[in-house]
Amino acid sequence: MSSLSAAYQNLAPRKDGAPAVILFSGGLDSTTVLALAKDLGYTPYALSVGYGQRHSSELAAAKHIAKQIGVARHEVVNLDLTRFGGSALTDSSIAVPTTPGKDQEIPVTYVPARNTILLSLALGWAESLGGLDVFYGANSVDYSGYPDCRPEYVASFETMANLATKAGVEAINNENRFRVHAPIISLTKAEIIQLGSTLGVDYSQTVSCYQANDLGEACGECESCRLRQIGFKQANVIDPTRYQKK
């Protein structure tokens, strides 16, 4: 199965322009998912969250990309998770690793319950819009050890969404239930890049680096940068990433 057909699997085109909330960081994966949702015919509502991440330049990238792709509305919600810490992304005293960790080990860049928190915000917005679809860029192939990027997590969150909301409880059939879509979850990074390139995504604007500077320039050394570099190489696509000068 091609990356294009795998991403579109179980996702029927929407001729009615139904609203969908896309959890959107401004990174490579979520930008691809945003472009995909729009291509499918959804009316995209992009949700970005400033949670105190050290790579906050991704939010500036998200604002630019949302305008470039064209969304119905882009919301940036501020939620300070640095008060809790527990992650190299929210606690400056914890170094971002520059060498791969052990297989299946949950890395220090894991932010406690982050995707559950962010998806809950997306779910709340979707329900207020009268929409039933939430998209996010989870990926379990180029696995970094994040528990909230696994297929079983996505399925469990969707179940919870339909138990915890008015719209879910009042649904009279499966067509009226909330759906949580993770369309690139089974794709490699190379396949994601190939898909996005087909959709016209400008990856030069995306920020994936855990240590990106204020200009959005990547360190080229962290796990996220490493996976991105390998992805472009395997996809046979020129890497447009802007790197910091050493």
Swiss-Prot record:
Cofactor annotation: Zn(2+)
Cofactor binding: number and manner: Binds 1 zinc ion per subunit.
EC number per UniProt: 6.3.4.20
Keywords: ATP-binding, Ligase, Metal-binding, Nucleotide-binding, Queuosine biosynthesis, Zinc
Any GO BP annotation: queuosine biosynthetic process
Chain residues that bind ATP: F24, S25, G26, G27, L28, D29, S30, T31, T32, V33, L34
UniProt GO molecular function: ATP binding; ligase activity, forming carbon-nitrogen bonds; zinc ion binding
Classification via InterPro entries: QueC, Rossmann-like_a/b/a_fold
Binding positions for Zn(2+) per the UniProt entry: C209, C219, C222, C225
Class of the enzyme per the UniProt entry, highest EC level: ligase
Catalytic reaction annotation: 7-carboxy-7-deazaguanine + NH4(+) + ATP = 7-cyano-7-deazaguanine + ADP + phosphate + H2O + H(+)
Pathway per the UniProt entry: Purine metabolism; 7-cyano-7-deazaguanine biosynthesis
Family: Belongs to the QueC family.
NCBIfam families, sorted: 7-cyano-7-deazaguanine synthase QueC
Function: Catalyzes the ATP-dependent conversion of 7-carboxy-7-deazaguanine (CDG) to 7-cyano-7-deazaguanine (preQ(0)).
Protein name: 7-cyano-7-deazaguanine synthase
Lineage of origin: Bacteria, Pseudomonadati, Pseudomonadota, Betaproteobacteria, Burkholderiales
